[in-house]
Amino acid sequence: MLPYATAAEAEAALGRAMTAAESLWFRYSAGIPDYVLFWHNILFLFVVFTLAPLPVALLELRAPAAVGPFKLQPKVRLSREEFFRCYRDVMRLFFLVIGPLQLVSYPTVKMVGIHTGLPLPSLGEMAAQLLVYFLVEDYLNYWIHRLLHGEWGYEKIHRVHHEFTAPIGFAAPYAHWAEVLILGIPSFVGPALAPGHMITFWLWIVLRQMEAIETHSGFDFPFNLTKYIPFYGGAEYHDYHHYVGRQSQSNFASVFTYCDYLYGTDKGYRYHKAYQAKMKALGQTEGEKADSNGLSYAKLD
């Protein structure tokens, strides 16, 4: 809740006139408690989990021939019932774990210094903070994800997420409840190290989940803008990890690829890409053995 009763008081405190964005923020948030503003994340996550995967899912279900050339595992076709079951299970997880976690997290958010006041951050400041959040979360997520591929972590927790060997967007948050709690920690570390405005935090949560949904989409569209982000993994990169499954010691990265490269956990993927290029050059001769999903992984690592 902003400590100003009127716009004039806010401008007096700022020592200048509010920008259009600040005026809009003042009108919306002045009378809303900070914890309620933070709880907006619950609504944002619900909308993202429900709507962001929907366009690709509808294309896959209603126009499979049109999007078939871009599907990473073309022989895997999920039914409408399987899509709905995934969404239903994600919503159960959302209402029992993710939503309640947001409700009780506000004291931590307040403690680290995420604020709702004026002035609003500049676009440059927001971009810099978001970059920090992505880099920090990606690094920590890499190591936690790698640990979850140990025997105990996989069998007890992470195997749930890998039930979808050919991932779909709705399956991005599909996981064991313990994994949701564990992997939620890296998402808060970046904002704790570089605390910013609540709007930046909202944007971070939304962008991170949309990135995860894109990565799990199961499609590699040539027009995707993420292809222009340096070191970005994307759907094709992460699809390999899901296909190989438990035995995979490759492609642990959640967003960028630098950790896999630095720590040598992309060797299987690079071998696979080299093998694909070789087979393509040979015209996909009989030496290539494709699996039932339409893929040809010569080496699983």
Curated annotation (Swiss-Prot):
Alphabetical UniProt keywords: Endoplasmic reticulum, Lyase, Membrane, NADP, Transmembrane, Transmembrane helix
Enzyme class: lyase
Subunit note: Homodimer.
UniProt main location, coarse: endoplasmic reticulum
Membrane topology field: Multi-pass membrane protein
Family: Belongs to the sterol desaturase family.
Its EC number(s): 4.1.99.5
Protein name, per record: Very-long-chain aldehyde decarbonylase GL1-10
Domain of life: Eukaryota
GO molecular function terms noted in the UniProt entry: aldehyde oxygenase (deformylating) activity; C-4 methylsterol oxidase activity; iron ion binding
Tissues showing expression: Expressed ubiquitously.
Stretch forming the signal peptide: none
The gene coding this protein: GL1-10
GO biological process, one term: sterol biosynthetic process
Subcellular location(s) of the protein: Endoplasmic reticulum membrane
Parts of the chain that traverse the membrane: 36-56, 94-114, 187-207
Catalytically driven reaction(s): a long-chain fatty aldehyde + 2 NADPH + O2 + H(+) = a long-chain alkane + formate + 2 NADP(+) + H2O
Domain Fatty acid hydroxylase: 131-265
Function recorded in the entry: Aldehyde decarbonylase involved in the conversion of aldehydes to alkanes. Core component of a very-long-chain alkane synthesis complex.
